[in-house]
């Protein structure tokens, strides 16, 4: 009956146990955040003292290139600096270009336009849990996106 990501307080209990072990060996933990921007889970993780590994940058960069505007990308970058949120980001990975994460920082119409553009260039949409029209990510390279 629980969601599959960040179940409170269970997630924090597990992370604290692992952190105690990791601290003994001077190993830092890097929780992966795969949730919509509007949920602000990256802030919760940062407020608990962890760096965050999130997935906003790839889609925001493509959006900036496609719209010829860095406004939303700059807004996000300024926000993480102002709030002193320590992040690790990537531009691409084996999973594709994340889209679910952009909900809340981009309008749904803008996300759909990105999907349509990338699919029009040969990309594929990976739907969340197999549900049609419930986008999760686009499988494409930056070159073809």
Locations of regions flagged by a protein language model:
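Active-site and adjacent substrate-binding regions of carbohydrate-active enzymes
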Residues: 1-145
